[in-house]
Structure formats: C-alpha cells, structure tokens
Amino acid sequence: MKGFLDTFYNIDTLRGTLVSDQAWQASWNLGVTASAAAAVACIGTWTTDFRADLPTIDVPMLVLHGDADQVLPLDKTSKRLPGLIKDVQLVVIEGGPHAIPWTHASQVNTALLDFLRR
C-alpha cells in the first residue's frame, strides 16, 4: 500500500509542498482499516469496461484530472471521454496527481463551482 499511496500523491515530487506527511499518514490509516475481502473484491471494478455505457449518459458531466496522474494517466483515461459522452467538460489540473482534491483543492473547487453555475 505504501507504493500505491506514494503514486497516489506523487510523493516523490510533492512531499513537503502540496502533500504533508500527515495527509499521507491519514490515507495509510484509512487504508489499513479496509477488510481484505473488500480490497480484493474492488479489483473487478477496475477491469470492467464501461465504454459502451458512456454514450447513454445524458446529463452534463465534469471530469477533473491531473496531468501528472501516475495511477490513471490522463492520455489513457479522461482525454478519451470527449466524443464518447454528449456533454462532458474535461478540466486538466496542471501538475496534479491522482489525489487532486488534496493537492490542488483550490483549482478543484473553482472548477466545481464554475461547472455548477452553468
């Protein structure tokens, strides 16, 4: 789990600036409370292909994604959504890891509020 959290936060570049040791530790503490059965069961959701369902989404959608996401790289995930979903707005957070609500909260909140005002 240490490796996942390090990648989740891009700890190699953001530790001590946008990610505190306390934030990392809080995530660790939460992760170790998960049941082993639940951890194994969730893996199936990562491998399910939902692409055929995307054109059926008929509500406006906001997708926020960090361009430095090492868990789910932008080019392989969110950048593919425009054209597959009718009304999708993709906001790319520069320098953002997978954990953008923690590391780039101001930008995430601004994007959310702008989207809700539409």
Question: Residue spans of the language-model regions?
Answer:
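Conserved alpha/beta-hydrolase catalytic His-Asp/Glu region
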Residues: 1-56
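Residue-level signal for the nucleotide or nucleotide-sugar donor/cofactor binding architecture
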Residues: 34, 52, 72, 100-103
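Active-site phosphate/pyrophosphate- and oxyanion-stabilizing loops and adjacent acidic/basic residues
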Residues: 51-52, 79-80, 106
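Short, conserved loop/helix-junction motifs that constitute active-site signature segments
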Residues: 55-58, 83-85
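Short beta-strand/loop motif that positions the catalytic acidic residue
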Residues: 57, 63-65, 69
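Acidic beta-to-alpha connecting loop that harbors the catalytic carboxylate
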Residues: 67-70, 95-97
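Conserved alpha/beta-hydrolase "acid-adjacent" motif
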Residues: 70-76
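Catalytic active-site module of serine/aspartate enzymes centered on a nucleophile-bearing elbow/loop
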Residues: 86-118
